[in-house]
Design a protein with these regions (language model features):
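Short glycine-enriched nucleophile-adjacent loop
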Residues: 231-243
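Non-catalytic accessory segments of hydrolases
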Residues: 6, 10, 19-195
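Alpha/beta-hydrolase fold nucleophile elbow
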Residues: 135, 208, 215-227
């Protein structure tokens, strides 16, 4: 029985890996703005593109204000649409969060030890064309909460093969994501929690609740799923009162 179960698990993981492929497979594809993907959101009017397999894709969506300067080591604040208005092309994923180079990232420049930028709270969305009330799958990447980024994974196959809207996000990592010190105390429970990476994920879910219907997703049918550290972060979503009502199912690997 154990042997059979092991085979089933391996086959299942291989299948998931095929459906949720690495974005590296799309390097030769050059995205072009598609007017059919224009969507109005709380982050502004977003223009995406049609992916190689037909999925509609929006990359580099700012879901929270840049956690820099006075917002470093503070709870995330919602992103706002630019005052000047206009259309924001979302063809390229946003910055990775600061981290050491790894197998999950690009190499560092010769003059830098780390990669990424503090201005990194971005998400990518993948949806079947003309989707309506489709289930939403909200991905939390792994990497020990110190490395990785949401854009390392493309949700195009998952969206097209299973009729779901896939959301992947970046969240703060390492000392920027989980850190507390008496000198940072403000008296605000969220700001003083030290759990900034967790709060980023919750802010991402709040953005989904307010906007995903415009992408064909159902805000009342949201599944959070993650692997490794992303699985632990998924458990944190299940445990946090702040995430209550923001999602309805969870998958932990």
């Amino acid at each position: 029985m154990k042997k059979i179960l092991g085979i089933v698990v391996v086959v299942a993981l291989i299948g998931i890996g095929y459906q949720f492929q690495s974005s590296e497979e799309e390097e030769e594809f050059v995205p072009k703005p598609d007017s059919a993907t224009l969507r109005k959101t709380t982050s502004g009017s977003l223009l995406g593109y049609t992916g190689a397999n037909g999925a509609w894709v929006w990359r580099g969506i700012r879901y929270a204000k840049a956690p820099t300067g006075t917002l470093r080591w503070r709870a995330p604040l919602p992103a706002k649409a630019p005052r000047k208005g206009g259309i924001i092309e979302t063809l390229v994923s946003g910055n990775a969060c600061p981290q050491l180079p790894s197998a999950l990232s690009e190499p560092a420049d010769e003059d830098r030890v780390t990669i990424g930028e503090e201005d990194c709270l971005f998400m990518d969305i993948y949806a079947p064309p003309e989707a309506e009330k489709a289930p939403v799958m909200f991905w939390l990447h792994g990497g020990g909460n110190t490395i990785g980024q949401g854009s390392s994974y493309s949700g195009e196959n998952l969206a097209m093969k299973h009729g779901v809207v896939v959301v992947t996000i970046n969240y703060r990592l390492g000392i920027f994501g989980w850190f507390s010190h008496p000198s940072l105390t403000t008296g605000d429970p969220k700001d003083d929690s030290g759990n900034y990476g967790t709060l980023d994920a919750i802010q991402g879910l709040q953005w989904v609740q307010g906007n995903i219907e415009n992408f064909g997703g159902d805000p009342n049918n949201v599944t959070v799923f993650g692997e490794s550290a992303g699985g632990v972060d998924t458990l944190a979503m299940m445990a946090s009162p702040l995430a209550e009502g923001l999602f309805h199912r969870a998958i932990v690997q």
